[in-house]
């Protein structure tokens, strides 16, 4: 399938390596735990979350708009701890990427939409920097997917040709945008399907 040898992987984090950091399921749990109006919280979230993910708001500023616009019986620190605790790893995917990197000497970069504090927490907690070389997070580069400029920035930072990059994301539209730049892509649906598709691009573990 792949005419060019793959030298670099671009990876989404939420939905691929880890659970999503702060999605509708996590917000529903928060509303139940802290007795919040879920509909109002979601409306406020959607109005301001893009700004947070683009690195133009701190987490405290985001929470001031979405949760702490009125007095609460709980503290911001308690709520932030709850937010951070929603993140869980997908160990099979992490092991797959780690082993492929070792076997093929791949450059590995994360290309994801995430606020700064959540990004840093997840990188440190799950030691993502032990196998990911570069983090092109929307909050670091101030560009969000599906803006093609985030992929252009990633290519420049990693110093890779688009034809030699394989990108894995659970959002098919994001994969399609990257393909428009000549980047090969896999729409991640499960560990098994992604592993099989990577094999079609010349990346398999065999008897590793």
Enumerate the predicted regions with their spans.
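Alpha-helical elements of Rossmann-like donor-binding domains used by nucleotide-donor carbohydrate transfer enzymes
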Residues: 25-29, 47, 61, 65, ...
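Short, acidic loop-to-helix structural element flanking the phosphoryl-transfer center
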Residues: 4, 68, 77-109, 120, ...
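Asp-based, Mg2+/Mn2+-dependent phosphohydrolase catalytic module
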Residues: 2-6, 11, 115-208
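A metal-dependent, Asp-based hydrolase signature
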Residues: 50-80
């Amino acid at each position: 399938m792949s005419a060019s040898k793959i030298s670099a992987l671009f990876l989404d984090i939420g939905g691929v390596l880890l659970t999503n950091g702060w999605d509708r399921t996590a917000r529903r749990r928060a509303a139940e735990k802290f007795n919040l109006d879920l509909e109002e919280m979601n409306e406020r979230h959607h109005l301001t979350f893009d700004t947070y993910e683009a690195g133009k708001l701190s987490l405290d500023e985001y929470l001031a708009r979405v949760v702490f616009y009125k007095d609460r019986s709980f503290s911001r620190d308690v709520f932030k701890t709850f937010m951070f605790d929603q993140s869980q790893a997908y160990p099979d995917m992490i092991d797959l990427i780690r082993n492929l990197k070792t076997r093929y000497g791949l450059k590995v970069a994360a290309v994801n939409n995430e606020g700064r504090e959540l990004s840093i927490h997840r990188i440190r907690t799950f030691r993502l920097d032990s196998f990911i070389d570069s983090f092109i997070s929307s909050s670091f580069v101030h560009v969000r997917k599906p803006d093609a400029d985030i992929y252009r920035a990633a290519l420049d930072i990693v110093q890779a040709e688009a034809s030699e990059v394989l990108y894995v994301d659970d959002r098919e539209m994001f994969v399609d945008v990257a393909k428009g730049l000549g980047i090969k892509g896999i729409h991640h649906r499960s560990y098994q399907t992604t592993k099989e598709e990577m094999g079609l691009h010349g990346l398999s573990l065999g008897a590793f």
